[in-house]
Structure formats: structure tokens, C-alpha cells
Amino acid sequence: METTLAIVKPDGVKRGLIGEILKRYENKGLRLKAAKVITPTIELLEKHYEEHKGKPYYKPLIQYMSSGPVFAMVLEGENAVKIVRLLNGATKVEEALPGTIRGDFAISTTFNIIHGSDSIESAKREIALWFPELA
């Protein structure tokens, strides 16, 4: 069974969207394997976003993601990575279609509500970072 990581970002937590987002995943057949509310450390975020280091949005992204609690979850199911990516919608808010999580709730590309692993390999790496007890 495939697993993936999804994170409701600080703006989604502050706006009370955890239940709505989780419901969308569960309605598509995904199961919640693990979850926690956490205010991520700079160290955790630097490891998570290491491939973005040096890009202009890197520091603001780290600041934003460490600004408050997030809801990190491991979801399990057939094609979990692909399903989460499709439900999340495009990263850029102007490209996110209505009916997707970002299309319905994102305010900007920076405050885009949700993270989802972009591949099976990324999911394994990210789950090990956020949920070392599952590794």
C-alpha cells in the first residue's frame, strides 16, 4: 500500500481547515495512518525543503512554515501520492482549479494551504523526517 505525506500549513490550521481537508482525502479512499499537530523547527524545515535552498522563496517559506502549528499526516492507499497531488491542486494559486484544496482555499502561492509529497521517493524521505517512529 502506498503512503504519502500531507501537511496542512499554518494558514490552513489557523483558518480551521484540517477537518475539511482530511475529509476530502478520506472521501477518495485514503486512510489516515498517522497524524500530529506540530510547530516545526527551523532544522526540520531546512531538511524538508533542502532542494529549494538558494531560491528566492526559500527563506520566506521557512519563516512561514515555522510561524505556527501545522497538521502533518501520513495517508495510505492505492496511488496515494497521485491522489493527494490531484486533490491539492496546482501550487500556484492562479493555476489551482476550483474543487481542489488550493483552488477553494488558497490565498496566495505562498499561503497555499497544503503540502503533498511529489513522488513516492519524496514521500519516503519526508515521512522519515516528520514521523521518524514510522521509519
From Swiss-Prot:
Keyword DNA repair assigned: no
Gene Ontology terms: biological process: CTP biosynthetic process; GTP biosynthetic process; UTP biosynthetic process
Keyword Disulfide bond: no
Residues at which ATP binds: K9, Y57, R85, T91, R102, N112
Protein EC: 2.7.4.6
Major location (coarse): cytoplasm
Single Gene Ontology MF annotation: nucleoside diphosphate kinase activity
UniProt cross-references to CDD domains, sorted A to Z: NDPk_I
Active site, UniProt feature: H115 (pros-phosphohistidine intermediate)
Keywords: ATP-binding, Cytoplasm, Kinase, Magnesium, Metal-binding, Nucleotide metabolism, Nucleotide-binding, Phosphoprotein, Transferase
Entry superkingdom: Bacteria
InterPro entries, per database record: NDK-like_dom, NDK-like_dom_sf, Nucleoside_diP_kinase, Nucleoside_diP_kinase_AS
GO cellular component terms listed in the entry, alphabetical order: cytoplasm
Coiled coil: none
Annotated catalysed reactions: a 2'-deoxyribonucleoside 5'-diphosphate + ATP = a 2'-deoxyribonucleoside 5'-triphosphate + ADP; a ribonucleoside 5'-diphosphate + ATP = a ribonucleoside 5'-triphosphate + ADP
NCBIfam families, sorted: PRK00668.1
Stated family: Belongs to the NDK family.
Subunit details: Homotetramer.
Function of the protein: Major role in the synthesis of nucleoside triphosphates other than ATP. The ATP gamma phosphate is transferred to the NDP beta phosphate via a ping-pong mechanism, using a phosphorylated active-site intermediate.
The protein's name in its UniProt record: Nucleoside diphosphate kinase
Source organism of the structure: Thermoanaerobacter pseudethanolicus (strain ATCC 33223 / 39E)
Phylogenetic placement of the source organism: Bacteria, Bacillati, Bacillota, Clostridia, Thermoanaerobacterales
